[in-house]
Amino acid sequence: MRYFEDIELGEVWDLGERPVDENEIMAFAAHYDPMPCHCDAVAAKESYFGSLTASSWHVNAMAMGLLTNIFKAQGLVSLGSPGINSVRWFVPVRPGDVLSGRSTVMAMRASNSRPMGIVTLRTEIFNQVRSKVAQMDGVGMYGRRPAKAGNNLS
């Protein structure tokens, strides 16, 4: 298990990569962001982007999937998130793109009221040519290392 105390300020996590599939783009859009540029390949050709593009919310969901895989791989004791401070999108994500990313620990502090630490992560997502497609500054809550039994001197 990896606790708040094991995280270091400035630490960078490689999030790995994932391909982006046309069917996945259209399925997500059909349910959550049914704009023609996301769910209709023919109409998308006439859009501002000139082709099918992933919804920005889909990009966020894919980024969260990459990040969550790292939490599991590292055994991080993640307790959820109170929110995202900022989200920016820079370049459209298209079918056939391969997304990769990194998260950097930007700030951290122990909670004054609960047995957890608060960590701000900057997550950057790139396409296969290393163009930044998105950036999120999010806040996460992480479990504190349990006190060892028998250490109570009172």
Label every PLM stretch briefly:
Residues R2-L9, V91-S154:
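HotDog/MaoC-like acyl-thioester-processing domains
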Residues M1-G83, R145-S154:
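Hot-dog-fold acyl-thioester-processing enzymes
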